[in-house]
Amino acid sequence: MSILQEIIRSRKLEIKNLSRKKPLEELRDELTSLDEPLSFTDALTGNRVSLICEYKRASPSSGRTYGRGLHEMMEVYREGADAVSVITENRYFHGSIEFLREASEYGIPLLMKDFVVDEYQIYQARASGASSVLIITGVFPDLESGIETCRELSMEPLVECHSAIDIYRAIEAGAELIGVNNRNLETLEVDLERTRALAPLVPDELLLVSESGVMGPEDAEILAGCGADALLIGTSLMLASDPRELLDEIMAAVKSCKPGRKRYSGDEFFEQFA
């Protein structure tokens, strides 16, 4: 069993138990008193490449636990991030839905990053202050339904893709925020070429977020040059001796990069994906 399969099985069991303790109807009732969330899409829309900075306590890909606290990193991110991703999966990433609630105090659009396997988690995200939810193609059972549920709750989901087929499925389902994860979720290996290969398939009217693999300003510049509208950066910032300095360097690297993607000719497309 792969690490992805283990995580999915774990999340399904945990959400089943959570929904017994707090039924979905009870979660829905909590939403009636909440203000509208900040717009995640607006935060990523502009004339420059946007940055989504991530808070996570651990990562199975590195086998490490990160010692920096949420509030320490939020103080850094509020000075340069356009939005913040908060990992809430607890068993493998040591995350918590409470981190999302605490991060919502900073007035920055938040992405709940998790392995979403049930609409219960979408309601949970909204109740905890999220502006967006990560929905992974092939993990969430009904992509179109998941997108619709997010929008009913005034959130725009980030739909994560790993292949050309994933992108076409996401577009067909109505996704407006397309994420390309440079990390293979089965092997945990990173390849920035994935964004370069898949970016031309994303229409200009949609926003493309390149996820994972930015270890420094050079990587950020490469991905921005591939046509990413936004970069999601986590591990390098969590590991940096001075995350503020690294964030400044990344901001400077992408400052002059304008969003925009090339298009494949028919021959180029078939050569790329043959």
Swiss-Prot record:
Q: Which GO terms describe its molecular function?
A: indole-3-glycerol-phosphate synthase activity; phosphoribosylanthranilate isomerase activity
Q: Which reaction is this enzyme known to catalyze?
A: 1-(2-carboxyphenylamino)-1-deoxy-D-ribulose 5-phosphate + H(+) = (1S,2R)-1-C-(indol-3-yl)glycerol 3-phosphate + CO2 + H2O
Return the EC number. Answer: 4.1.1.48
Superkingdom of the source? Archaea
The reply on keyword Lyase is yes
Name its pathway. Amino-acid biosynthesis; L-tryptophan biosynthesis; L-tryptophan from chorismate: step 4/5
Q: Name one GO biological process term.
A: L-tryptophan biosynthetic process
Keyword annotations from UniProtKB, A to Z? Amino-acid biosynthesis, Aromatic amino acid biosynthesis, Decarboxylase, Lyase, Tryptophan biosynthesis
Q: Which Pfam families does UniProt cross-reference here?
A: IGPS
InterPro entries registered for this protein in UniProt: Aldolase_TIM, Indole-3-glycerol_P_synth, Indole-3-glycerol_P_synth_dom, Indole-3-GlycerolPSynthase_CS, RibuloseP-bd_barrel
Family the entry assigns: Belongs to the TrpC family.
Tell me what this protein is called: Indole-3-glycerol phosphate synthase
Upper classification of the source organism reads: Archaea, Methanobacteriati, Methanobacteriota, Methanomada group, Methanobacteria
